[in-house]
């Protein structure tokens, strides 16, 4: 560290970091004691962190990088670790990686007082102080290090405002070089390692594609974007894509970049984080469109790509006029929809029967087909399956021109195989590329979902599950006319069926009183199957029982699976559906 004014012995950090029992030192990870009065830094950061905290473990390397860079630049800066670990060994192992000072773990009173003084409600937490006066520069040190890195030093309000002004000026004067270049780098790279001058992008439309290796939505998005990219190249459009990797290591970067046909900012370049901040990245996938003049045309066209898939190239360069044309084409495509246009992609012109037999899609043409989006890991899907199997068999007894195709969201072949083994219908193979496109066409955001396709290949309804649960096999063929007819009949039956049922009751499966409630579909917390129309419900606990289950003499209905699979990342299960988040 560079020399700076000593912290005052009777104020500032000298007072803040000392203990009531006279301790006047901090520790290095070598166990050496450092007099607090000897700290020469003018800016001191208190780092509240703990080894058991995953966000802390992710942030600590970033703070170490910033600290080392500031020290190497001769900046007057110090960090003091304030541990939230539960034992000395955990403290020692975590502190061993840190190049700065720490309050002794044994001084639990001082640690508690610091947490109380700065009202620490969560970690990691970085409070940055004027060492001499103890004045708080900021309590948002974690966010500032994430956003600005060492440029935020000395973390004063004046410096942060200055950086914001610089960002505004940069946006006002944005060029392709200011976006992608640095004082020491005027090139991008290919996945072969070749350097391509940034000047080659002048006069072109450029997409900035933010990428994280292995993240499902990004992997799916970039596979579609690659098709659009190749098509635009083939028709001679001046279009380029630049990958902006948010991965922290070279292996992940290389794995992401290996199959991409476009350019990238080199791995580890700080410009990647700057661009994420510059364009206020809040979610992935994200694709920013830059015009031929280097100005931003659209902050994010990922939704356009997501909605139209590979056909989105026809909307390039995604102006209002082009998007209107694209929407018209999408409408016309929907109107000309056939079962084969939905289920046939290149050589993928089949679905799977039992024992892996390939059934040509052509054999399904002219039938009413339900597309069943589901997964074994999803509790509502497991609860719905017995009902669906039962009604499927009833429909097939009367109507041979009917079929279901299972479209799985499972991640493992074993789970897929086990779940499919209990289904008497057909399926797409696990991981089939048609699943992604069908999910987009029908905007599937939760499972289980049932989409009904009529004999003419047109969509009858995107929600066949609700009428099937309500009316069973009688809902076939799921047309609006049929459902209106059934609703009239059902309304009368519903009112008649509840005659004689108690309005309220107590049941062994729940502590609170259950109230007879008119409702739509729900999952019974007694037998784990679907129900509708009437439930004995506890609104306070969101607890439901079928009237049949509730009115049994004993509350010994078998409860749900104890060892159910957990939902994978990106899904949350609530009630009778698992949704993407």
Swiss-Prot record:
EC class name: oxidoreductase
The keyword Zinc appears for this protein: no
Classification via InterPro entries: C1-like_sf, DC1, Nucleoredoxin-like, Thioredoxin-like_fold, Thioredoxin-like_sf, Thioredoxin_CS, Thioredoxin_domain, TryX_NRX_thioredoxin_dom
Classification via CDD domains: C1, TryX_like_TryX_NRX
Pfam families tied to this protein: C1_2, Thioredoxin_8
Sequence ranges assigned to domain Thioredoxin in this UniProt record: 1-165, 178-322, 328-488
EC number: 1.8.1.8
SUPFAM superfamilies per record: Cysteine-rich domain, Thioredoxin-like
Matches recorded under Gene3D superfamilies: Glutaredoxin (3.40.30.10)
Classification via PROSITE patterns: THIOREDOXIN_1, THIOREDOXIN_2
Catalytic activity: [protein]-dithiol + NAD(+) = [protein]-disulfide + NADH + H(+); [protein]-dithiol + NADP(+) = [protein]-disulfide + NADPH + H(+)
Function field: Probable thiol-disulfide oxidoreductase that may participate in various redox reactions.
Stated name of the protein: Probable nucleoredoxin 1-2
Source organism: Oryza sativa subsp. japonica (Rice)
